[in-house]
Amino acid sequence: VPADCDPPRTTHAALAARLGDARLLTLYDQATWSEGPTWWEAQRTLVWSDLVGRRVLGWREDGAVDVLLDATAFTNGNAVDAQQRLVHCEHGRRAITRSARWLPRRWA
């Protein structure tokens, strides 16, 4: 469900100054419970978890959304390490895991 607060509102003066006239944009609305967004510069992809859907998704600048990982152990946090590998916090296993090797699903 798209957020119904455009422009974003806040009572925090410093945040309000930073937001300026920013507008909210819905990039994807097919996730049940989204958490853990991070920007993966090497792939120019916004990565986040669909916790309930048990998958990690990636939004590319052309608007496409790919399933990067499926059947996860309830991944709820993501990061990118110095070698540009994805690192995930897994709620189900109470573990931190890393995607050591990455093969693109599509070639530009």
What residue ranges belong to the model's regions?
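Sequence-structural signature of mature extracellular/luminal beta-sheet repeat domains
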Residues: 1-108
